[in-house]
Amino acid sequence: MTFKEKVNELITEALLEKPSIFLIDLAVSDSFKISVGLDGDNGVALQDCIDISRAIENNLDREEQDFSLEVASVGVGSPLKLIRQYKKNIGRTLIVTTNNEKIEAELIEANDVFIILSWKAREPKKVGKGKETVQKEQQIPYTEIKEAVVTVTF
């Protein structure tokens, strides 16, 4: 078992006690710097990071392999990677990049196959001059999404 596999196993075991928290990123550098990125259905509390950090640190032997450890919540501007993240962000505005376009819109639905985005657009009137505001919706399969990021509005 590699060092990274061992760390991943320890994280998986620790997360069994915290079903609302899930692993987004795990990186282990050549110099054995462990970086863990977590997310949660209701966010990630500092105590969650501490608990996961302790679960890793207490089960690895620094005599066998010295390492540094960083456990954190993924940032608001981090790309969404799991379907579970899309589902938790329904109702929020996303910037979604696909192969053909970049869309900024509200996420109104997320299931196991695709998401549905909704936004308002100005289009030429069907009759007469000028433009009118119309509501648009687009269904995008996860397989077509290159990147999706939640936008922060103040």
Swiss-Prot record:
The keyword Ligase does not apply. InterPro entries: Ribosome_maturation_RimP, RimP_N, RimP_N_sf. Keywords: Cytoplasm, Ribosome biogenesis. It comes from the Bacteria. Its main location: cytoplasm. One of its GO terms (biological process) is ribosomal small subunit biogenesis. Gene3D superfamilies: RimP-like superfamily, N-terminal (3.30.300.70). It holds the Pfam family RimP_N. GO terms for cellular component: cytoplasm. The keyword Nucleotide-binding does not apply. It is found in: Cytoplasm. Belongs to the RimP family. Required for maturation of 30S ribosomal subunits. This is Ribosome maturation factor RimP. It comes from Flavobacterium johnsoniae (strain ATCC 17061 / DSM 2064 / JCM 8514 / BCRC 14874 / CCUG 350202 / NBRC 14942 / NCIMB 11054 / UW101) (Cytophaga johnsonae). The lineage of its organism: Bacteria, Pseudomonadati, Bacteroidota, Flavobacteriia, Flavobacteriales.
